[in-house]
């Protein structure tokens, strides 16, 4: 059935079109689920199509936008599952998705969901972030130049550094935040999120890619 679907010239275009905000929840959700299934089993063919289809990747990225406590969060969460698989081992799609604003959208989700304490949604967003950075020098440079590595520290709840000339009360407050960081509790999900985030930081520092 997948082969027959992919043989249809406009099948994938139709699926991507169904992700539009103009369609209802069930239509968008069903299209996303089918795309996840196709990417899981026929990833290379889907990637080739997305590279040539007008607005192919942007239709997926718009699914990452969600209003709090609404059905669009379900759409967003499904899109988070699709994104890492869609860009995997394909530097061209990784670059296109990054330049269309994926980094910013993923970081917004991570912050909105509670940073590393945010559960599995944060894990999925971090997986997407890592998939865009892994072995892609262009994306690593783009992230460093437009967003910067220090932006990731607060996601771990690590306090940002203070200037050397900071007044005493600021130093005391900084020390309090450092102690809070050291004494925070680490459950299994939080550890998983932190490990993925640290891997992202390592990719940016090492700068190894294609």
Language-model segments: residues:
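Eukaryotic Ser/Thr/Pro-rich intrinsically disordered, low-complexity regulatory regions
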Residues: 177-180
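Flexible, disordered linker segments and immediate boundary regions flanking tandem C2H2 zinc-finger modules
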Residues: 108-110, 154-157, 167
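Active-site-proximal polar cores
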Residues: 198
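Elongated alpha-helical scaffolds that mediate protein-protein interactions in large eukaryotic proteins
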Residues: 1-16, 20-32, 37-61, 69-77, ...
């Amino acid at each position: 059935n997948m082969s027959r679907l992919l043989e249809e010239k406009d099948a994938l275009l139709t699926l991507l079109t169904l992700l539009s905000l103009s369609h209802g929840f069930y239509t968008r959700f069903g299209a996303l689920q089918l795309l996840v299934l196709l990417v899981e089993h026929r990833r290379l063919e889907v990637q080739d199509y997305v590279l040539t289809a007008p607005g192919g990747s942007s239709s997926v990225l718009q699914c990452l936008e969600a209003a709090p406590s609404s059905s669009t969060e379900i759409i967003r969460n499904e899109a988070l599952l699709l994104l890492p698989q869609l860009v995997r081992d394909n530097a061209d799609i990784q670059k296109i998705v990054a330049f269309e604003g994926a980094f910013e959208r993923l970081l917004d989700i991570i912050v909105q969901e509670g940073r590393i304490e945010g559960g599995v949604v944060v894990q999925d967003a971090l997986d997407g972030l890592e998939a865009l950075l892994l072995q892609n020098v262009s994306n690593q440079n783009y992230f460093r130049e437009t967003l910067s590595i220090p932006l990731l520290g607060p996601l771990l709840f690590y306090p940002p550094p203070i200037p050397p000339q900071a007044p005493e009360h600021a130093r005391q407050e900084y020390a309090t935040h450092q102690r809070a960081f050291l004494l925070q509790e680490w459950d299994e999900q939080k550890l998983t999120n932190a490990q993925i985030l640290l891997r992202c930081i390592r990719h940016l520092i090492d700068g190894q890619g294609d």
